[in-house]
Design a protein with these regions (language model features):
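Short helix-loop-beta junction
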Residues: 23-33
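Structural motif
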Residues: 6, 9-12, 61-62, 65-70, 86, 92
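Structural signal for conserved beta-strand scaffold positions within catalytic alpha/beta enzyme cores
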Residues: 8, 39, 87-89
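Long, charge-dense
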Residues: 86-121
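Metallocofactor- and cofactor-centric catalytic cores in central/energy metabolism, strongly enriched
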Residues: 36-67, 73, 78-81
Length: 121
């Protein structure tokens, strides 16, 4: 069995996406050791995204991402499609839905959930 690679891409620390990958992968024991997870935190620009997609293509990795900036989400989706790299957006669809329901644009500031946790807990 060949190794399955996940690239976790985030504009914050990447914990949310990594936990989601682990939740999925845990359902496929005893093959857990056949999975490689690599985290790419604090991604803020197109140059980083282009490099990650290039590496993912070479390594046949699946990209799982949590980016709050719509411009970066769209770019990653487009580059993934152009390069034949599977890309999964964990936050975008929910952010788009909440934006429509609240009729309000999101702040698009990375790391706010960590500030919230510090405030409440």
């Amino acid at each position: 069995m060949k190794k399955l690679r996940f690239f976790v891409v985030s504009d914050s620390v990447g914990e949310t996406a990594e936990i989601a990958v682990m939740a999925v992968v845990s359902q496929f024991r005893p093959n857990f050791d056949q999975v490689d997870i690599r985290r790419f935190p604090h991604i803020q620009d197109m140059g980083h995204i282009e490099n990650i997609v290039t590496i993912a293509k070479k390594q046949k990795a699946i990209i799982i991402y949590t980016l709050v900036k719509k411009e970066l989400r769209n770019a990653l989706d487009q580059l993934g499609e152009q390069n034949g790299v599977q890309v999964i957006d964990l936050l975008g669809p929910m952010m788009d839905l909440v934006e429509k329901k609240l009729e309000q644009k999101p702040l698009e500031k990375p790391g706010l959930v960590h500030q919230l946790n510090d405030f409440y807990f």
